[in-house]
Amino acid sequence: MTSTDVQVALTFDFDGYSTWIGSHRATSPSMLSRGEFDPIGARRILRVLEQAAIPATFFVPGHSALAFPPVVCAFRDGGHEIGHHGWVHENPVLLTREEERSVLLRGLEALDKVAGVRPSGYRSPAWDNSPSTVELLLEFGFEYESSMMGNDHEPYWCRIGDAWSTSEEFRFGLPVDLVEMPVAWHLDDFPQFEFLATDKGYLPGGRAPSTVLEIWKAEFDFLYQRIGSGVMVVTMHPQIMGRGHRLLMLEEFIRHVASHERAGFTTCQDYVRQWRKGRSPSLPADAGDNRLTR
């Protein structure tokens, strides 16, 4: 992280086939072929990042790393961060604790085998954590995770033991030594652009890049002008953002950020390590008194 006050973390989920196999249960080569575009989109994005001389974070499922090893090595060789993104894009909420532990281990083994990296960061497939996720991430030595939305432009400490029901007041769990790099659906390209048919209906996608660019630029401008410091985490997928008209939008967004004197780009890891200095796990400032005690 540089000395600039406002940072943008460009993050890319290199899902490959895994999202269509693990999350969407692909039964046809046509659906699966969407993931085959991921390496093409990723190579294009890498060229954009290289030309702009900016770092990024790539969250990679183990399945995708083994399917497309040269691309994952290109992330590493380009000086970018590689994060953990499950094994085959499975939702942790649907797993037992032991199954989730196995998924974390299998993903780590794949990333080590392909690129020789041990990620410090994790992003849950589908942005959905189980009651066991935070404890397991601590067990495996992760420094941060990036799947929750309890803030917008400020990291915060993850917790263990939050409790809620319709009949009782919310109870805050124990803050632990795991940092959350918050995300947001309006800063994710998937719901904006991807067409998806499910048994529950359609995700229409297909929005004009100009509309999404307007949202992202406005979010950045609010951070820069009104808050004055912090981080904006943008989530993209090479198989989506790597399409020509959207890649032009990404280039325009990068130019917009770069035109501001106090702004720069960061990896999630770099921002988290800087943010941690002088801080220790704590609850949100506005948390009530109903709290879990040891």
Residue ranges and their predicted role:
Residues T4-V8, A52-A56, G78-E81, A115-S120, ...:
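Short, well-ordered coil/turn segments that N-cap beta-strands
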